[in-house]
Amino acid sequence: MNYKLYWELTNEGGARLLRAFGETPEPRFPAEIEGRAITEIGDYCFAAQAHLPAECRCSYVQAETEADGAPETAPDGEMQAEPETDGAPETAPDREADVMPGADGTPGAAPGADGALAELAGAYITRVTLPEGVKKIGNFAFYNATELAELELGSGIDTLGSDAFMNCRSLSRLLLHAYPGQKTGLRLLLAQLSSDLEVALSGENGVWAKLLFPEYYESYDEIAPAHIFGRNIVGEGFRARQSFREDVLDFAQYDKIFPQACVDESETTLGRLALDRVRYAAELSEAPRGLYEEYLKAHSGYLIRRITDDRDLELAEDCCSRKFLTREDVAACAMRAGEADWAEGAAALLHLMQQYFAEKTPDERYSFDDF
């Protein structure tokens, strides 16, 4: 994957990414630029408005793929800005023919048949993978990235600028590279994201924990005539976001929100939260596990809708194996799949019904004629 990256040196000798152009709305950025580790994301880097400094470097980079080795910087000296001998950065190049930037601060156009690169900013980007070594995300870094749905990054974030995710209305998933017990920058990220957010923690063997942080709202009421404002918080998502101990995620504290959440939150929110905890049961003790499982068994209708709406047979088998669904539930799920013209799902669900539940008498058996 080819990228054109504008950047500058940090005081520590790393690279601060300022602006990026690429071939896909789901960029996966390299770890280095010209041998410099990318450690910072600059102010407004992925925002719809460009805020490049007067002087910065520009490099063409071929990013690493699963089949390739380490990322390489384009060797052509005419396409790659080199630092001056005195170490001072070069002036940022003018807009070039191979880049299709947006007008009036809007995101760049999508890559065209001529190989043009799109400006990776604003509404164009949908999923971003930041380099593992990034420690700082600048002010308004993702401002007005309205279609950004998922962000993948390492555990080392220790500085997050003001309103880094302002107007990122579609951002609903974080994939964080971390191992159990590790300090992360998740608390900082959650403090700026108040909408529903599913966080997956991934290590060498894949995802080992998945948590839903529900949406919450804040409001302030003036207490007249002293002009004192009272703070009101609605939603258990706020308490969930406090489940940290010295920047380490505290699963036991997180699990304590569920009883009150059952009073305040919707069935969809509670179902997602409970499923994530029992399917990725990191540090899950028996008492909260029992509460989650009891809730799911009592709300099989949610599971049926989710299986058929998402067409998720893996979830269906998981629910059968954990006895969250009864034989009648699976039959209803198969019926709903048939009504949705999901023939493959209906057949698979009937197979699961036979596999996990004892057959009834011949008169009670279901057949494809029922669907």
Report each predicted region and the residues it spans.
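Structural signature of tandem-repeat unit edges
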Residues: 2-14, 21-39, 51-72, 76-80, ...
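Extracellular beta-strand-rich solenoid/capping regions of secreted or surface-exposed proteins
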Residues: 41-43
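A cross-kingdom feature that marks long, compositionally biased intrinsically disordered regions
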Residues: 284, 288-303, 326-329, 339-341, ...
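Conserved hydrophobic site in ankyrin repeats
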Residues: 318-320, 349
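Charge-dense, extended regions
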Residues: 335-371
